[in-house]
From Swiss-Prot:
It is an enzyme of class 4 (lyase). Keywords: Iron, Lyase, Manganese. It comes from Yersinia enterocolitica serotype O:8 / biotype 1B (strain NCTC 13174 / 8081). It catalyses: D-mannonate = 2-dehydro-3-deoxy-D-gluconate + H2O. Coiled coil: none annotated. Pathway: Carbohydrate metabolism; pentose and glucuronate interconversion. Its cofactor is Fe(2+); Mn(2+). This is Mannonate dehydratase. The gene is uxuA.
Amino acid sequence: MEQTWRWYGPNDPVSLDDVRQAGATGVVTALHHIPNGQVWPVSEIKQRQAEIAAKGLVWSVVESVPIHEEIKTHSGNYDQHIENYQQTLRNLAECGIDIVCYNFMPILDWTRTDLEYQLPDGSKALRFDQIAFAAFELHILKRPGAEKDYTAEEQAQAKAYFDAMTEADIAKLTGNIIAGLPGAEEGYTLDQFRARLAEYDGIDKAQLRENMAYFLRAIIPVAEQVGLRMAVHPDDPPRPILGLPRIVSTIEDMQWLKETVDSIHNGFTMCTGSYGVRADNDLVKMIETFGDRIHFTHLRSTCREGNPKTFHEGGHLQGDVDMYSVVKAILTEEQRRQAAGDMRPIPMRPDHGHQMLDDLHKKTNPGYSAIGRLKGLAEVRGVELALKRTFFPELK
């Protein structure tokens, strides 16, 4: 596997020097300063490449080229936004970048309720609390019809949770959910968020699938022409939230995506933390079934709690993800590709590390502090080395 590292550009507290010292060789980044829907100029791409190359690294994967909301809702200037997206792909390919990670989650990117969940050892993790989220939906956002998405017990727990909140607690929870986490290109106020939700009135799972299919039928032929591989990231959490449909959450969704535009360029990001939140997602089976379409991997683990929809980020080798078996399945796919003449390793990045040690005293991007990811990368690297020595000695 190619060892890569997510970097949020010049404003990231983690520097490219840090990335190199962590042992990564590839950088996963994006042009975050360019507004959603606009073309990424070749000059801007090359400038970012030069910054990365100056530190002895390479820009391996784009994460992400954001998809404008009007594409997802199939409204407004969606065709123009798609044309701009196509041109961005051409420009990236012209610069030699050939993997693009993206997602099709409505409105919000990945979602958490607690960005500073303290673990028993004193480190901090990200957490999604189903009851806290219910309290937000029912009593802060006050989304009409939200009660249908929760059991009577969850509604009662959410009411008790909300009643115990201070104004500061309410502001913090609201900000955590709608203000935009790292990688999300847009944040909202409550009123803006309500207006954005209203744009999805009448868009169910079938309609969102059709909107994504329209996008893919326009994008994948361009990717084929320029030799670029698209890698869709799963929903996080992998289920409907806020009354919004989610369509990249299960192995059935992966099959639908494959069949919708059946091209090797229409592929997946295997994010074990996102898919792994669901106990019914068999990660190894997913890799074995769609191995030739997996162009990028995010390796992390989560820990499901008493409420099966509540989880927190675990250590990379702890939690509900069997990282040993996952890495073995990825290496099996790499071996198959190399036997067929494709010597390119599959890019992997350690996802979401715990905030720990010296990083507890620094301002960091939630989930993206240096030391926790350094630990995760070292652990996954060790698993990979042991597996290669034991089962895959011929792998490069």
